[in-house]
Every structure is written in C-alpha cells, then in structure tokens.
C-alpha cells in the first residue's frame, strides 16, 4: 500500500518555516514522497526530489469556494482568538481529502515540523496498520501550529 507525507502552506509560510521542513526531509533521506498543498502558484516554489507541489484551490475547488464564503465572516472573533479561523484550518482538511487519490496511507506533517532522522518503513506499519483509519486534531493546550 502506498504511503505519503502531506503538508500545507503558502509562500509566506514557506519562506518563514516550511522550507526548513523540506530541507530536513531531504537531509534525513525520507523514503516516502512529500506532497505539499499550496494556496498559490506552484511555480513560486523550488524543485526538489521526491517533493510534489499541488495548488490546493485547483485540486479542491470547493476549498476556494469555502475561502471566499468565509474569509471575512468571523473577522472580529479571529482577531481575538485564532481558533475561530475556520478558513485557516480548512486547508488541512481539504488537502488530506484530496491526497487520498495519491496514496492509501497519509501522514500529515505540520509545515513547522522538522525531520530529525529517517523514519524506518516498519514504523509506518506499526503506527497505521492497513486495517486502521484515523484522523486526530488534538487541541490540548490549544496550540495548533
């Protein structure tokens, strides 16, 4: 069964920290491909081996519709508490849904994460056996990014 890593970011977040995720992915010689869903033109990003950039709004037009409908809907609440920013969190959900067409097992990696060493293939099977489907958006302490 095919396995992939998936993440989301835009050009601003790429320049801020997602480029470090990709560099650590390459330096640690990860064996699974990394699918990066972005909100902007994929031509803005450098080319890397085993890293694929996908425009999220083209792959999932309903995500763009959701963005347009909701981008200003809760602006007052979002300024006070980012947890109300449904648009911000929708990118992860739409990317994970779209990525199912590329693999049977999807491992979502936040863009501000770093790989410290290569993850052995055996770990993936222990973490997510073939008979399991799980999605966890744990919010203990409310730190989300």
Locations of regions flagged by a protein language model:
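N-proximal low-complexity "stem/linker" segments adjacent to membrane-targeting elements
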Residues: 1-19
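Short, charged/polar "capping" segments at the starts of alpha-helices
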Residues: 14-16, 40-47, 143
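Short, acidic, metal-binding catalytic loop of nucleotide-sugar glycosyltransferases
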Residues: 23-32
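Short, polar loop motifs at secondary-structure junctions
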Residues: 37-44, 117, 139
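Active-site-proximal specificity loops/subdomain of glycosyltransferases
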Residues: 43-100
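Short aromatic/hydrophobic "clamp" motif used to bind/position activated sugar donors
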Residues: 106
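The conserved acidic donor/metal-binding loop of glycosyltransferases
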Residues: 110-114
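Conserved donor-nucleotide/metal-binding helix-loop-beta segment in metal-dependent transferases, i.e.
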Residues: 115-145
């Amino acid at each position: 069964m095919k396995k992939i890593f998936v993440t989301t970011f835009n050009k601003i977040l790429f320049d801020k920290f997602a480029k470090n995720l990709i560099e650590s992915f390459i330096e640690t010689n990860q064996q699974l491909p990394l699918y990066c869903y972005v909100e902007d033109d994929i031509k803005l990003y450098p080319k890397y081996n085993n890293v694929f950039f996908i425009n999220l709004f083209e792959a999932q037009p309903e995500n763009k519709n959701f963005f347009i409908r909701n981008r200003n809907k809760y602006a007052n609440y979002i300024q006070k508490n980012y947890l109300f920013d449904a648009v911000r969190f929708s990118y992860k959900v739409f990317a994970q849904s779209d990525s199912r067409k590329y693999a049977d097992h999807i491992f979502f990696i936040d863009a501000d994460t770093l790989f410290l060493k290569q993850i052995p293939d055996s770990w993936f099977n222990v973490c997510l056996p073939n008979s399991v489907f799980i999605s966890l958006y744990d919010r203990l302490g409310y730190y989300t990014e």
